Design a protein with these regions (language model features):
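Core catalytic alpha/beta fold that binds nucleotide/phospho-ligands
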Residues: 1-123
Length: 123
């Protein structure tokens, strides 16, 4: 409910651009000029994407004040439907410098979203 309110409010497009990367915005139908309200499923997906960002920041140990923007950490879906992280900008450099890869699991039900992030050292 909070995500739908944030995205549907008067500053929804600004919020979307600050929080969600291009692939997430496209998947959620948040492109500029699209003023249609978010469906319950899309709002739940947006909440899960946000939870994925929080899970990554916690696993990385940086918190929200970390060295990168939320829109640089994207939760995308593979053709199979499986979620996967896509990093850009500072988050991609941070991952590369540390030789890390991230695994992601998402779930949402009953208005709640849950994400798990596991960071592994590339070998």
């Amino acid at each position: 409910a909070r995500m739908a309110k944030s995205l549907g409010g008067p500053h929804g497009s600004t919020f979307a651009a600050r929080v969600f990367g291009p692939a997430e915005q496209e998947a959620l139908g948040l492109s500029e000029g699209n003023s249609s309200p978010l469906s319950a499923h899309k709002a739940a997906s947006a909440a899960a994407d946000f939870a994925a960002k929080e899970a990554f920041l916690k696993a990385a140990g940086t918190g929200l004040a970390g060295p990168f923007a939320l829109c640089e950490i994207e939760a995308v879906r593979l053709e199979s439907g499986a979620p996967e992280y896509r990093f850009s900008g500072g988050s991609a450099r941070w991952m590369d410098e540390r030789h890390l890869r991230a695994k992601l699991s998402l779930s949402h039900d009953g208005g709640m979203a849950l994400a798990f992030c596991i960071l592994e050292t590339e070998t």
